[in-house]
């Protein structure tokens, strides 16, 4: 039986009464948010709206994005990445558990020097994929061309954000490459590994 979203006490500054809010709303008020599922349009829009709102509210205080995600839709993930680059506050990314596929792309998009992985976190990069099994030939060709463009864009971002040569990133993206937290740090995807 699911327990639902826990409620926690919260008191607004200057108010005497405590109210009970769900834990995510409480954490949002502290500028902490979570990507703990597959990336899709819905979660992408929620994270984007949170980043923009909190950026408008106070543009000098960092935002913190905790990631434990198997990846998901490429375009939705790229929208999160682009928003992270657009908002004025630095977005610190913290990998806890897994940042795979487009989630690792979001992880590498955190502010340089402020990308962290927990000691037992795993990171996986690979090339974007699609399912062609029911496409007509013309659609197949157009989709393959779009995938190549997306791969070039993703590769370019990894090169820029990690400092690795393009041939290293391209070679790694040929297959699923899983990394420990320290390997991700050596690869330039994160800057720090949290101390145990």
Curated annotation (Swiss-Prot):
Matching InterPro entries: ClpP, ClpP/crotonase-like_dom_sf, ClpP/TepA, ClpP_His_AS
Q: Which reaction does it catalyse?
A: Hydrolysis of proteins to small peptides in the presence of ATP and magnesium. alpha-casein is the usual test substrate. In the absence of ATP, only oligopeptides shorter than five residues are hydrolyzed (such as succinyl-Leu-Tyr-|-NHMec, and Leu-Tyr-Leu-|-Tyr-Trp, in which cleavage of the -Tyr-|-Leu- and -Tyr-|-Trp bonds also occurs)
Please give one Gene Ontology molecular function term for this protein.
Answer: serine-type endopeptidase activity
Its Enzyme Commission number(s) read 3.4.21.92
Principal subcellular localization: plastid
Which residues of this protein are catalytic?
101, 126
Q: Kindly report, in one word, the top-level EC class recorded for this enzyme.
A: hydrolase
Q: Which UniProt keywords apply?
A: Chloroplast, Hydrolase, Plastid, Protease, Serine protease
Q: Which GO terms describe its cellular component?
A: chloroplast stroma; endopeptidase Clp complex
Q: Does the keyword rRNA processing apply?
A: no
Function of the protein: Cleaves peptides in various proteins in a process that requires ATP hydrolysis. Has a chymotrypsin-like activity. Plays a major role in the degradation of misfolded proteins.
Q: Which HAMAP family match?
A: ClpP
Its assembly, as annotated, is: Component of the chloroplastic Clp protease core complex.
Q: What is this protein called?
A: ATP-dependent Clp protease proteolytic subunit
What is the species of this protein?
Answer: Barbarea verna
Its taxonomic placement starts with: Eukaryota, Viridiplantae, Streptophyta, Embryophyta, Tracheophyta
């Amino acid at each position: 039986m699911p327990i639902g979203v826990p409620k926690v006490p919260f008191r607004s500054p200057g108010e005497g009464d405590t109210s009970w809010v769900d834990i995510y709303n409480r954490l949002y008020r502290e500028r902490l948010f979570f990507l703990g599922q597959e990336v899709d349009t819905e979660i992408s829009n929620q994270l984007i709206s949170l980043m923009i709102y909190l950026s408008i509210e106070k543009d000098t205080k960092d935002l913190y994005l905790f990631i434990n995600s198997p990846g998901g839709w490429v375009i939705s993930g790229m929208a999160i990445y682009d928003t992270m680059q657009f908002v004025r506050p630095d977005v610190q990314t913290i990998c806890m558990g897994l940042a795979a596929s487009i989630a690792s792309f979001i992880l590498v998009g955190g502010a340089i020097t402020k990308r962290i992985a927990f000691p037992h976190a795993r990171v996986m990069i690979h090339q974007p994929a699609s399912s062609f099994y029911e496409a007509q030939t013309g659609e197949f060709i157009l989709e393959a061309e779009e995938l190549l463009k997306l791969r070039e864009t993703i590769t370019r971002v990894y090169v820029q954000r990690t400092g690795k040569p393009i041939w290293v990133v391209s070679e790694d993206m040929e297959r699923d490459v899983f990394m420990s937290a320290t390997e991700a740090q050596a690869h330039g995807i994160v800057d720090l590994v949290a101390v145990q």
